[in-house]
Design a protein with these regions (language model features):
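Hydrophobic aliphatic residue packing
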Residues: 13-17, 106, 135, 458
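Outer-membrane beta-barrel proteins and related beta-barrel translocases across Gram-negative bacteria
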Residues: 63, 88, 136, 142-159, ...
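Gram-negative bacterial Sec-dependent N-terminal signal peptides
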Residues: 2-25
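Selective for proline/serine-rich intrinsically disordered segments
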Residues: 4-5, 29, 34, 42, ...
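Post-signal-peptide, soluble extracytosolic/periplasmic N-terminal scaffold domains
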Residues: 26-183, 269, 273, 358
Length: 792
């Protein structure tokens, strides 16, 4: 069975446009009046990725034409040929046996058609009709009112004069001197207007010599049209096509206009190709005033066993100035992204993600528009893997490579390539209280100029669980065996990173096939007490949950083992209960530790957690030789969360070390909802000798239509902001506008220290959305969703 890609809405124009905007997305409207269900539910507080709000018509006034809309009427025009015609009226003159003269609340119904008028002449033989006075007509897909309407019910054609019309599958409406229905699917309006705004309050509209509506293709076509904002014409369009339902169609998408410090002014005029129901493409030619032309493209496909997307950007001759370590001026440049998922058999899939740039400075030069500057990109990864999973197991075989896209560093900063890797995990319940599991991995690590080799890691375990809702004990016994096979010239490398040694250097790698084997034993236990309490007049359940976690791992000297993909993780609350503080298999910490922690929660009557506070610390019975400290205690780690209502929340964490007698880490995040459509975030993050930063972000509604957006991150050590964004948004019944400017210290994101040539860069973008006609593709949303928690 052929599958269909999701629809894309667009504006098709047969002339070069000077509009400001970008790619359009699907928009539909309900045929009835605006109801409370049309409004969007606010994203819950604390949600990291809130979906963009779809175009909303909640601010639109009800169309008076909908007063005669009959929702019980059929929406199937094909029933006309087999359905009888029903005519009702207060007065009927049938002196002519073939022509009936009806007056007084006349109604004519057949299948999806309904005609109302003050008077009507109906020929029972030819089925011709002539309606006059307060004519109202409904059929599948549209409503219209007119002063006079003539037609034939069998042929499904008619002509109406002095027309006002309303589309039912979209909010499109307008007026026309004449409306002509050729059949059940095709209508043409002469000297007509079209808009999705409130009737009589068109913020935008186009006026055309003719507007043709084809319900079969879902396309409307206007000829000799002028686009107007209010009453002011600003663009002549000899030909314009637009969607009248949610079907996809080929045509121009809205252009995008932006500006960045390295690209200059940018103009993009994408063209969408609806090739088939299950695959499509977009061509995206661009002009950068500071760099020259670019051709971009996207191809999407969806088949029963495979789906994917291919994106490419190509610059034939870059005119920009050199930056970083590579000279790319007057060269070809490109970026390729390919993703694919193919079902092979059963639960096995082939998953591919290929990303490649022509040079290390590509993202630095072409990543400044707001669509791609949500985060600094330093490394591109490409992965191809075959993955499978069952009820108790998962496995994968694949390869991963990396490309450096930081123009200020060499490829030495890259991670090891994994060529190839294989993983297998299982977790099998043996009894209701006993389970057996295993995590295994085999990887070949490759990196020019550094020690290379293969590593196998085997990690089986046996765990039991005893407990009730009031207590639990979870003993676990594991065994970790790690083996290496280093390349033949392994003794030429040394140091903490395994780099090539110079003359006279001595390698710490003494064996070509070193191994490490050790047991890992832990016992996790806890109690849970609860009581009823009240706070601020509300009833809650308060819990008290003490927890003890003992971990024993014997010491193994691992100095002769290379470090391929392992890092010491940042210490946090969950590290109190972790068997290893290292992220990879190259290092396994030794331990003879006991963690003591205490948590208390407040749960409301629905079981929703409204407050939680946790405090914990590790006691070391012996020095940590692999990590490298002889502390008796770890830092105190505390967490606090509070959300007594759905309109605000507070999260905080804190670490204080009795060893250094200093604060090691602290964070504070406050989120407050402002009105129905606003949000305010205040944050502070600190990590000793690494980071101290304040942040404020939010969306502030000025009115139902206007709102301000902004975010700023201030670095205390640097004494200035590292990133700031500010903008304004306007949203009405039928038009939405977004304008955002971003100012940031770009080089700091690429790891350069302060004072090493850092400069402030800027990017600006403007989006316009004519609701129901097309949109810009939410380019700005990706940036604001990252910088403003809870943004929609």
């Amino acid at each position: 069975m052929t599958r269909k890609l999701p629809p894309r809405r667009l504006l098709a124009v047969a002339a070069a446009l000077a509009l400001i905007g970008h790619q359009a997305k699907a928009e539909t409207a309900q045929p009835g009046r605006t109801t409370p269900e049309d409004t969007d539910t606010a994203c819950p507080l604390g949600t990291f990725h809130c979906p963009p709000k779809p175009p909303s018509y909640a601010m639109c006034r009800p169309n008076a034409m909908l007063d005669f809309y009959d929702p019980t009427l059929s929406r199937d025009p094909s029933l006309r040929e087999t359905s009888p015609t029903s005519v009702l009226a207060q007065h009927v003159d049938s002196s002519d046996q073939s022509v009936y003269h009806l007056s007084g609340d006349v109604k004519l119904d057949r299948a999806d058609q309904k005609l109302q008028a003050d008077s009507l002449d109906y020929n029972n033989v030819s089925t011709d009709y002539d309606a006059r006075g307060n004519v109202r007509y409904q059929e599948a897909g549209q409503l219209l009112s007119a002063s006079h309407m003539q037609g034939n019910t069998n042929a499904s054609h008619g002509i109406a004069h002095d027309v006002s019309y309303q589309m039912l599958d979209a909010r499109g409406n307008g007026v026309a001197e004449q409306g002509q229905m050729f059949d059940a699917q095709r209508t043409r309006y002469t000297r007509a207007t079209y808009s999705t705004c409130d009737v009589g309050h068109h913020v935008w509209e186009f006026r055309a010599k003719s507007i043709a509506i084809d319900k079969t293709t879902g396309v409307g076509v206007a000829r000799n049209a002028t686009m107007r904002l209010g009453k002011v014409p600003f663009l002549y369009l000899p030909y314009i096509s637009f969607p009248v339902n949610d079907q996809r169609k080929s045509g121009f998408l809205y252009p995008v206009f932006g500006k960045s410090s390295r690209g200059g002014f940018e103009l993009s005029t994408p063209y969408y190709l609806n090739l088939a129901p299950n695959y499509d493409a977009t061509l995206d030619p661009r002009i950068y005033t500071a760099r020259g032309p670019m051709l971009g493209g996207e191809f999407r496909y969806l088949f029963p066993r495979t789906r994917g997307q291919f994106n490419v950007q190509y610059v034939p001759d870059d005119r920009g100035e050199r930056v970083g370590l590579e000279d790319t001026k007057d060269t070809e440049r490109y970026l390729v992204n390919f993703s694919n998922v193919t079902r092979l058999w059963g639960s096995w899939n082939l998953i591919s993600s290929i990303n490649r740039a022509s040079d290390s400075g590509y993202y630095y030069d072409y990543g400044e528009d707001l669509a791609t500057t949500g985060a600094v990109v330093r490394t591109l990864s490409s992965n191809v893997a075959v993955r499978g999973a069952g009820k108790w197991w998962s496995a994968a075989v694949g390869a991963t490579v990396y490309q450096n896209v930081n123009p200020f560093v060499t490829d030495a900063s890259l991670q090891y390539r994994q060529l190839p890797y294989a993983t297998f995990s299982m977790d099998v319940p043996l009894t209701p209280w006993l389970e057996f599991g295993m995590d295994t991995q085999a990887v070949a690590f490759r990196k020019p100029g550094y020690i290379e080799g293969e590593r196998e890691d085997l990690y089986p375990y046996l765990a039991a669980y005893f407990g009730t809702p009031a207590w639990f004990v979870r003993p676990k016994v594991a065994y970790r065996y790690t083996a290496y096979q280093l390349d033949g010239d392994f003794q030429k490398y040394g140091g903490s990173r395994g780099a090539l040694l110079g003359a006279g250097g001595v390698s710490q790698f003494t064996e070509q096939s070193p191994t490490r084997a050790l047991p890992i034993v832990s016992v996790d236990s806890g109690l849970a007490f609860d009581r009823s309490t009240s706070l601020f007049g509300s009833s809650y359940t308060q819990t008290l949950e003490p927890r003890l976690y003992y971990l024993y791992v014997p010491y193994r000297n691992q100095n002769n083992l290379p470090v391929f993909d392992t890092r010491l993780m940042s210490f946090d609350y969950w590290q109190l209960f972790s068997p290893n503080q290292f992220s990879g298999a190259d290092r396994q910490m030794d331990a003879n530790n006991l963690t003591a922690a205490l948590t208390s929660r407040l749960l409301d009557e629905n079981g929703v957690e409204r407050m939680s506070v946790s405090l914990g610390q590790i006691h070391y019975f012996s020095p940590q030789r692999v990590v490298g400290n002889d502390w008796v205690h770890s830092a105190y780690v505390a967490q606090f969360g509070l959300q007594l209502s759905d309109r605000w929340r507070l999260n905080s964490s804190y670490q204080w070390s009795p060893n250094t007698r200093m604060t090691e880490m602290g964070s504070f995040e406050l989120q407050r909802r402002v009105g129905d459509d606003g949000i305010l975030n205040v944050s502070y993050h600190y990590r000793r000798n690494l980071l101290e930063q304040y942040g404020v972000s939010g969306v502030y509604p000025l009115s139902d239509r206007w709102r301000l957006v902004g975010a700023v991150a201030w670095s205390v050590p640097d004494g200035h902001s590292v990133e700031a964004a500010a903008g304004v948004q306007y949203d009405s019944c039928c038009v939405a506008l977004r304008l955002v400017e971003r100012n940031y210290v770009k080089q700091s994101g690429y790891g350069l220290p302060a004072g090493s040539g850092n400069q402030r860069d800027n990017a600006i973008m403007f989006e316009i959305v004519f609701k129901g006609l097309g949109s810009s593709g939410h380019q700005i949303d990706s940036l604001l969703q990252r910088d403003i928690l809870g943004y929609q």
